[in-house]
Amino acid sequence: MPAIGIDLGTTYSCVGVFQYGKVEIIANDQGNRTTPSYVAFTDSERLIGDAAKNQVAMNPKNSVFDAKRLIGRRFDDSKIQEDIKHWPFKVINDNGKPKISVEFKGANKCFSPEEISSMVLTKMKETAEAYLGTTVKDAVITVPAYFNDSQRQATKDAGAIAGINVLRIINEPTAAALAYGLDKNLKGERNVLIFDLGGGTFDVSILTIDEGSLFEVRSTAGDTHLGGEDFDNRLVNHFAEEFKRKYKKDLRSNPRALRRLRTAAERAKRTLSSSTEASLEIDALYEGHDFYSKVSRARFEELCGDLFRNTLEPVEKALKDAKMDKSQIHDIVLVGGSTRIPKVQNLLQNFFGGKTLNLSINPDEAVAYGAAIQAAILSGDKSSEIKDVLLVDVAPLSLGIETAGGVMTKLIERNSRIPCKQSKTFTTYADNQPAVTIQVFEGERALTKDNNVLGTFDLTGVPPAPRGVPKIDVTFDLDANGILNVTAKEQGTGNAKNITIKNDKGRLSQADIDRMLSEAEKYAEEDERHRQRIAARNQLETYLFGVKEAAENGGDRISAADKSSIVERCSEAMKWLDSNTTAEKEEYEYKLKELEQFCSPIMTKMHKGGGDGQQAPNFGQQAGGYKGPTVEEVD
C-alpha cells in the first residue's frame, strides 16, 4: 500500500505518489493536477474542490476557503480579524477558537478549520486512491516552514479527522528542495535558497544539498500570512473604489458582487504575469451596473509594492541566520504560484545582484513532489533513486520557559536541527516553595509576554528548602514533526512531570478528533447517498427520453394508440421528475420499474413488428440486467 505526499495549500492542494522509481503528480476527477482548497455546502450536498469553487458566486456565504489562514490560530489574532473583512463566509468565536458557520441542508452548522482542512485532505486522498486503485492510509503532509507548534498540531489533527495516518509533517520549502535536488541530479555541495510564495503563506529556506542526497536545512524565515490572496485583496479594493467613483455605490456590502469581482481580479492578476495590461468585463455586477475596467502591470505593482518589497526581509534574515553571504548561494529556486509575478522575480534578482533565478521546477507541484519522496522514504521504499536521501530540518522558532521577571530563557534556539533534545537546570525563587510552574513559550523576544505561550504545567512535591537549593532539570524534546515534548524533574526526589505541548487553548482533544472523524464518515456516507440518488435520477431520465424517442420515431412499427400512451406516460413521468427534484434513490428506482413494466411490452411488440432483426433499444436497466454504464456526468 503506497504512501502519498499531500501539499495542503491555502488556495490549491496537490497530491503525489512515488512509484516505479519516479514521482507521479495525480490529476483529480476534472483532470486538474491541483485542486482548489474549497468546501461548499448547499441545500442538498457538500462539494469539495473544483465543484465547490465553480459555484462560489451563487453561494458565497456557504463556500469556505482559506482554512489554512485560520488553522491553529486564536479568534482574536489580528491577522484573522483583518481577514474576516474579506471573507464572505461567517467566522464566529467559540471559546477563543475561530469556527466557520454555514447553512447546510437547511440547518446551521459550525465547523472548525481542522474539519474543513480534513475535507480537502479527504478529497486529495480519494484522488490518489482512484489513480492507484487501492485504499491509502499513510501520508506526509506539508506545512509552511514558519508554521508554529499549534498550527502544526492542528494540521496533524486535520489528517487524523480525514482518516489519514500522518507519517510526518514536513516543511514546504524543504519538500521543494527535495524535488529540486532529486530532479536535477545535483553534483557536489550546493547552497540552495528556496523562495516559496504561495496563495496565503511565504517561506524562505536555505539548504545545503550534498551530492543530491544529503539535504541540510541551514535556516528558515517567512510570513505565515503573505501570499497571492493579499495581492488579490489590493486589486479588489482598487476596483471597488473605482466602481464607487463611477456609480456612487459600494458593492462591498454584497457578497455575490464581491465574489464575482474577486474572481475577475484574480484572473487579471494572472494575466498581468504575461501581459502588461489586463481588462475586466463583468456584466450586471451590482444593482444592474456593468463594470468594464483595465489595469496595467505598473498599476498592480504600485498597489502591491510594499507587499512585494516585504518578501526580501525574510531573505535577509535567512541569510543572516545561515551565516551566509548573498554570493554563497548557488541556486535560487522559485516555488508557489505567486513567484510567477514579474516584479517579485525582478526584486529578488536585483537583491542577488542580477543572478539568474532557477525556474526549472513546476512551482505548483514541487512541494507535493517532495512530500511524495519523503512519504516513500518513511514507508520503507528502498528504490535506488531515494535510498541515500537524508533530510535534516530545523526548528523555525526558539523554544524556552519563563523565568523570574517574565524573562524568556531559551532551551532550543531557532534553526536548531530537528529532532533535538536540550536540558537546563533551574531552581526555586522563594524559600520552601512546594511547587514550580513551568510555562513554555515560542518566539524570539526577550520577554515572554511578547512571545507565544504553548502550554503550562506544575511540578509539585518539591521538598521544602531555602530558595536556590532544589534543582529542577527541564528537558525539551522536539520531534521530527516539529512538535514539542517537555519534561521537568526534581533531582532530589526524582519527581517528574511531562507534557506534549498540545496548546490546549487552541487544540482539539482526542474526543473532539474522534467525534469529527465519525462526523466525517457520516458526511462521506451522505455524499455517497447523494451520488446514488443522482445516478438513479439520471437512469430514469435516460430511459424516459430513450423510450419516448423510440416511440416517436417508430413509424409504422408501432400503433398510434401505443405511441400516444407511451408519450403520455413519459410526459407524466417528466412532470413528476420536475416536481420531485429531491426524491430519494428508491423513489426514482420504483418509478423506473413502473415505467419499464408499462413500456417494455410495447417496445418488444414494436421491435417484433419491425421484423428487421435489429436489437431492441436497451434503455436504463431492462430485464436481462443491463451491464453498461447507465449514469451520465452531472455538473
From Swiss-Prot:
Keywords: ATP-binding, Nucleotide-binding, Phosphoprotein, Stress response. The modification Phosphothreonine is found at T127. It comes from the Eukaryota. Residues 606-635 are annotated as: Disordered. InterPro entries: ATPase_NBD (IPR043129), Heat_shock_70_CS (IPR018181), HSP70_C_sf (IPR029048), HSP70_peptide-bd_sf (IPR029047), Hsp_70_fam (IPR013126). Coiled coil: none annotated. GO terms for molecular function: ATP binding; ATP hydrolysis activity; ATP-dependent protein folding chaperone; heat shock protein binding; protein folding chaperone. PROSITE patterns: HSP70_1, HSP70_2. PANTHER family: HEAT SHOCK PROTEIN 70KDA. One of its GO terms (biological process) is determination of adult lifespan. Pfam families: HSP70 (PF00012). This is Heat shock protein 68. Gene3D superfamilies: 1.20.1270.10, 3.30.30.30, 3.30.420.40, Actin, Chain A, domain 4, Substrate Binding Domain Of DNAk, Chain A, domain 1. Belongs to the heat shock protein 70 family. GO terms for cellular component: cytoplasm; cytosol; nucleus; plasma membrane.
